[in-house]
A protein has these predicted regions:
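Beta-strand-rich recognition/accessory modules
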Residues: 757-863
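Polysaccharide-binding surfaces and accessory modules of carbohydrate-active proteins
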Residues: 698-777
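Catalytic and substrate-binding regions of extracellular carbohydrate-active enzymes
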Residues: 502-727, 819-823, 827-835, 842-850
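Long, low-complexity, polar/charged, intrinsically disordered or flexibly structured peripheral segments
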Residues: 123-210
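Aromatic-lined, polymer-binding surfaces characteristic
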Residues: 209-453, 459
Length: 1023
């Protein structure tokens, strides 16, 4: 038969023990047992919803059952037929070029009936679709032009494996030009390894089809068949699935992506080139389902003589070894599929977030006493999955280091969510192998609880996940979280908060509270009844929030109405994957749209030029560029002020390491309500050091209107200069990774010189996503208050392969040019509907002893005559403000109506006085040092303080900021006052392991003895 390379080490030892004479062979399905299947059948008889689930499963599997066993067997392609996730992403379609770009990253569909030709359609057995042909969704041209299936069959060896050298080359011709003398006879012909277009460019259509259509279709078929078996106990579904799984076990030992990587084929492999069927980062999730499905159908294979007869016949016909018994077949699957998955983990050809879950599933599917337990033990070891992976990716690592203290993973957006969602699955996975009792995840890993709670905390307005880093789309909108998540969390923890979340996400419908496996339970409504009984009935209110290592904060209005609410968010995370160079990037939601839309996910990841030079660059974000280079966003940031005292919510975040050799890089932002429907934003960006400070903004449209300032059109070039063409990198040593990105800004207008006076820029929002109601006309108006050396407008492009993304956005760049710059950019953002509510904004004169760029006072005059005065100081400062206002602190706000003071707010301050109206405080903040920490109780992390807080200090629910050399944010909500200090409750103060190779050595902490602490106090006065 085949000569498979057997890897040395632990995986080989396990392989021998599984197949050895002392091993107890698998006896039963474990993930979905016979008892669970019986419950499903009973529930089908009792409940309409269960009967519909069964009917749906039967429908999904129908086409697969209709195929004969030989057809199924032939679906599985072998190693030498390449796989690729792109055809040619640089050139697009051979016929229409970049006309295909708006259709997404992976746009090709199966040729044939367009109504059936979705991205990953089954094609071999779906009537109306053409096997091994791809269709451009834009121009509808079909490639390749040859009959690849006939060629494929001619190239099979004795094992039924594809060998290109065996193929009949006479079959490799363009069917539209069958005459050998036709010059187009060989054009657009793909032998599996790509075709050449009329310009000599390579396009990899068959490899794309093999990856996206063929293998994805195989996995979907297995899912459908296994699910149908689990809900019917009909062995016909198990039979068909077993044919596929046995054949996969034939080909899988040879599967290796790296040879194709060396040939230029692409897949998701973190740049390593490694993988098995597909790239290593996606392989784990793909093969996990194969292992799960094998376990599910195992019971249905028992006693199936027809199955044995078929597989035995194919083995004899193709010299595949002895498969004359069910024991031989299941042994073959265990050795050549399940244990090959283990070997893939060992040699790192299987990576990604699913590795530990895959190992548990393999152990469960093997169901071999002793061996299965040892396989599961390995996921807790520092060396997992391999000593060749020096970082280690054990479950301990995931639940202590990778997952942040708030429950989100160490990457941006959807990537961070995937780590979190991966973590949540482990308790349920281990429950499927109850013989394993050596670890208790709920007791050992307190961050696990937070993974069930964090999704609502990540959102703005309970409606949208900010598009942080490589995530989301430009102006996209969408809620995350699901009732099923909170139901599962409640099942594990019996946590009141999770019951409340489940009830809210289910809109109070008990039927939506059924767990995902409800059909397999004896009483599927028991948990929904319990949740309905304990869920709270208090009105839900939004709150301002922040997450530490992830580095995202949200200030928002309290009413949970996305159409009327307003929210801002800031980015300041530390060491996040898929991060952009976006330190202190600002976002704003108002009037049901994204007013400062981040560009979101790039057209492609990897080394895609536009991704690095533009989409992920600093200049494309709403933040400050220094030295005309990108900032070092992943150096982290720290919150120094966080107050939510409606109608004012204010924060300050510092990112001192965003650039080398600077003294300050910090942003103060306040969200101020003027009514139930409108708020404005004060934005103060302070920076000291470096050259050329450029503050970039872009609004929700491709056009912008400037008032009070004349702009001059630059007829040629880009923002990089009139002689620099689009995307050009003219500088010495300039690359896509170090460029300023200025050459990606085009259609430039400039002020022609310094600007000293106040001006505005107005964007009328474009409705790209159907979010603007009839009769509404949202705008964003920016009030610029800072003298600068130049103002420029230019257009920049969002990724063009994301549905709903605009063609371009209009950027405002305010530049202060020079050496050793000291800047205080002061900007007011006014999101409004149809008619502005601000008449004018102006800087007020101030007198104080601090540096000029550390203090600012602004008057905001409303159309109705109301005047707000806002004062922002970098540090606590005594200030006299124009108009007889006295202030001593960091942030203050006064609202004056008809000449009378109506309200005051101040933070980290002791005095705010307007005439005879004063707000005074003896204690602007509590300050001191940390004397001890205690993280022994995962529900009560304690920090001792000197001096300790008075028992009656009004600080519970407020923020405590710790100042130390930890690069990530060290701000916590105070959950309780203790005798010696405070408690952060269940939000841990643990950072990571002291020694990643020895977990018993203990932990590093985010807070330590002698760290300085500050608890700013906040005060208000309403008249």
């Amino acid at each position: 038969m085949m000569n498979h390379l057997m890897l040395a080490g632990t995986a080989m030892i396990f392989a021998i023990s599984v197949m050895g004479g002392d091993a107890v062979a698998k006896q039963q399905s474990r993930a979905i047992t016979a008892e669970m299947r019986a419950n499903a059948l009973a529930n089908v008889e009792r409940y309409d919803w269960a009967a519909e689930q069964q009917s749906s499963a039967i429908r999904a599997a129908r086409a697969w059952v209709a195929m004969d066993d030989d057809e199924l067997w032939e679906l599985i392609t072998s190693q030498e037929l390449p796989r690729d996730i792109h055809t040619n992403k640089e050139l697009g379609c051979p016929n229409c070029g970049d006309g295909i770009v708006p259709y997404g990253n992976y746009p090709w569909t199966t040729a044939g009936d367009a109504s059936k030709a979705n991205l990953r359609s089954a094609s071999i057995h779906v009537e109306g679709l053409i096997p091994w042909k791809l269709r451009c969704p834009n121009c509808e041209e079909v490639y390749p032009k040859n009959d690849f299936w006939s060629y494929y069959q001619s190239a099979l060896d004795e094992h039924g494996f594809f060998r290109r050298e065996l193929g009949d080359e006479s079959l490799l011709y363009n069917e539209e030009h069958p005459d050998p003398d036709d010059p187009l006879h060989k054009l657009y012909v793909d032998d599996g390894y790509g075709l050449t277009d009329s310009d000599g460019n390579r396009h990899r259509f068959i490899a794309y089809y093999n990856s996206w259509m063929q293998w994805t279709n195989i996995r979907r078929g297995l899912d459908a068949l296994a699910h149908a078996y689990s809900l019917t106990s009909d062995p016909v579904y198990a039979h068909k699935a077993a044919v596929l799984i046995d054949r996969i076990a034939d080909v899988y030992p040879d599967m290796d992506f790296e040879p194709f990587h060396r040939m230029g084929f692409e897949h998701s492999h973190w740049g390593t080139g490694m993988g098995r069927i597909i790239g290593c980062s996606w392989e784990g999730g793909a093969v996990q389902r194969m292992a799960e499905n094998y376990d599910i159908i195992f019971d249905g294979m028992q006693g199936n003589e027809e199955l044995v007869a078929f597989i035995s016949r194919k083995a004899e016909e193709h010299n595949l070894g002895d498969k004359s018994s069910l024991e031989a077949i299941t042994g073959h699957i265990a050795e050549n599929m399940l244990m090959e998955f283990v070997r893939g983990l060992e040699d790192l050809r299987i990576r990604g977030r699913a590795r530990k879950a895959l190992m548990i599933v393999i152990a469960t599917a093997l169901d071999t006493p002793g061996v299965s337990e040892e396989l599961i033990d390995r996921i807790f070891e520092p060396g997992f999955p391999s000593e060749a992976d020096p970082d280690g990716r054990s479950l301990n690592w995931l639940l202590v280091e990778c997952i942040g203290r708030d429950g989100i993973g160490r990457e941006c957006g959807g990537y961070g969510l995937s780590w979190m969602r991966s973590a949540r699955q482990y308790p349920a996975l281990l429950e499927k192998y109850p013989e394993y009792t050596r670890r208790d995840l709920i007791a050992e890993f307190p961050k696990l609880r937070q993974t069930f709670l964090v999704e609502p905390r990540l959102m703005a307005l309970d409606a949208v996940l900010p598009p942080y880093g490589d995530s989301g789309s430009t102006g996209g909108w969408g809620r995350i979280g699901a009732a099923a998540t909170f139901v599962e969390g409640y099942r594990l923890y019996r946590d009141q908060r999770m019951a409340d979340l489940a009830w809210r996400y289910a809109d109070g419908d008990p039927a939506r509270l059924r767990p995902s496996n409800a059909i397999f339970l004896e009483d599927p409504d028991a948990l929904p009844r319990e949740i309905a009984a304990v869920a709270g009935d208090e009105d839900f209110r939004l709150r301002c929030d922040h997450l530490g290592r992830y580095g995202q904060l949200v200030l928002q209005t309290e009413e949970p109405d996305a159409a009327r609410g307003r929210a801002i968010w800031l980015a300041f995370g530390w060491a996040l994957g898929h991060r952009h160079a976006d330190a202190l990037n600002l976002g704003l939601y108002a009037h049901n749209i994204d007013m400062l839309p981040d560009l979101g996910y790039p057209e492609y990841t990897g080394a895609w030029p536009k991704r690095h030079a533009w989409t992920a660059n600093t200049i494309s974000h709403n933040t400050l560029v220094i030295n005309d280079v990108r900032n070092r966003a992943n150096s982290g940031g720290q919150i120094s002020l966080f107050a939510c005292e409606p109608p004012v919510r204010v924060t300050e975040v510092m990112a001192p390491d965003a650039y080398d050799d600077i003294d300050a890089y910090r942003r103060t932002v306040a969200l101020v309500d003027i009514s139930d429907d409108d708020s404005y934003v004060l934005d103060v960006f302070r920076a000291r050091g470096g050259t050329n400070h450029r503050l970039s903004y872009h609004g929700p449209a491709g056009a912008a209107t400037v008032e009070r300032l004349e702009m001059i059109e630059q007829p040629t070039g880009t923002f990089a200069g009139p002689d620099v063409e689009f995307a050009e990198l003219p500088g010495e040593g300039e690359t896509i990774r170090n460029t300023s990105g200025f050459s990606y800004l085009y259609d430039v207008e400039r002020s022609g010189g310094p600007v000293e006076s106040y001006y505005t820029v107005d964007w009328q929002a474009e409705d790209r996503r159907g979010r603007i109601a009839e009769g509404r006309q949202p705008h964003l108006r920016l009030h610029a208050l800072t003298p600068v050396d130049e103002v420029a407008l230019a257009s920049g492009d969002p990724p063009q392969n994301r549905a709903g993304n605009p063609r371009s956005l209009r950027y405002l760049i305010q530049s202060r040019i020079g050496e050793e710059m000291q800047s205080q950019f002061v900007t007011m953002l006014e999101p409004y509907d149809t008619t502005p509510f601000i008449s004018e904004v102006r800087l007020l004169e101030t007198e104080h002893a601090a540096a000029a760029e550390t203090v600012v006072a602004v008057a905001v005059e409303m159309i109705d005559g109301t005047v707000d005065i806002l004062i922002s100081c970098e540090e606590r400062t005594r200030v006299e403000v124009e108009g007889g206002i006295e202030f001593d602190g960091r942030f203050g706000m006064v609202r004056i109506e008809n000449g009378d003071v109506r309200l005051m707010r101040m933070s980290d301050a002791s005095l705010l006085r307007v005439g005879d109206v004063a707000l005074e405080a003896e204690q602007p903040a509590w300050e001191g040092v940390v004397t001890a920490i205690n993280a022994d109780d995962p529900a009560d992390h304690r920090i001792s303080l000197d001096p300790p807080l008075p028992p009656d200090a009004d600080v519970v629910g407020r923020r405590i900021h710790f100042h130390n050399d930890v690069p990530k944010d060290t701000t916590w909500v105070i959950e309780a006052i203790t005798e010696t200090g405070i408690s952060t409750g269940e939000i841990t103060i643990i950072w990571d392991f002291l020694d990643s190779s020895d977990y018993a050595a203990g932990f590093r902490y985010l807070v330590n003895e002698d760290d300085r602490f500050v608890i700013p106090n906040h005060f208000g006065l309403d008249r």
